[in-house]
């Protein structure tokens, strides 16, 4: 249900998004989004600190997007999420960016 709230937020910010986008390396981004300027975002959804700790692939996603975010529920501790990515707190009805992701690319990435 986190994905639904995140996608509503992205749509309100002018992004079109899809879930489970297959990247060229075979991995799947939980949410990938693009806006009219061609800015590409990837949002990885984490349901718990354990889910995050088990994920070793998230750093590789930065090469596939302009900005990388994690999305968590309000029940997931914020302090376990890395500072290298933006942070979105979401529920089924909406979401809020609590930490903006830094721009990772000056030139446009390809979807790996």
Predicted region positions:
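Flexible, charged surface loops at secondary-structure boundaries
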Residues: 10-11, 35-36, 62-64
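Non-catalytic C-terminal interaction segments of nucleic acid-processing enzymes
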Residues: 1-25, 80-112
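Amphipathic coiled-coil/heptad-repeat helices and related helical stalk/stem segments
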Residues: 2, 27, 53-57
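Short, Lys/Arg-enriched charge-dense amphipathic segments
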Residues: 38-48, 97-100
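Catalytic cores of nucleic-acid endonucleases
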Residues: 46-92
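Short coil/turn segments at beta-strand junctions that form active-site/ligand-binding loops
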Residues: 15, 39, 66
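Active-site beta-strand-loop-beta-strand hairpin of nuclease catalytic cores
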Residues: 25, 29-42
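Short glycine-rich, polar/acidic loop-and-turn segments at beta strand-coil junctions
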Residues: 21, 33-35, 46-47, 74
């Amino acid at each position: 249900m986190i994905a639904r709230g995140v996608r509503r937020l992205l749509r309100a910010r002018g992004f079109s998004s899809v879930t489970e986008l297959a990247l060229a390396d075979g991995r799947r981004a939980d949410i990938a989004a693009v806006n009219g300027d061609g800015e590409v975002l990837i949002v990885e959804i984490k349901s718990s600190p354990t889910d995050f700790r088990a994920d070793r692939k998230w750093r590789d996603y930065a090469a596939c997007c302009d900005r990388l975010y994690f999305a968590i529920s309000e029940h997931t501790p914020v302090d376990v999420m890395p500072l290298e990515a933006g942070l979105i707190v979401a529920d089924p009805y909406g979401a809020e960016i609590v930490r903006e992701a830094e721009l990772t690319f000056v030139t446009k990435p390809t979807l790996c």
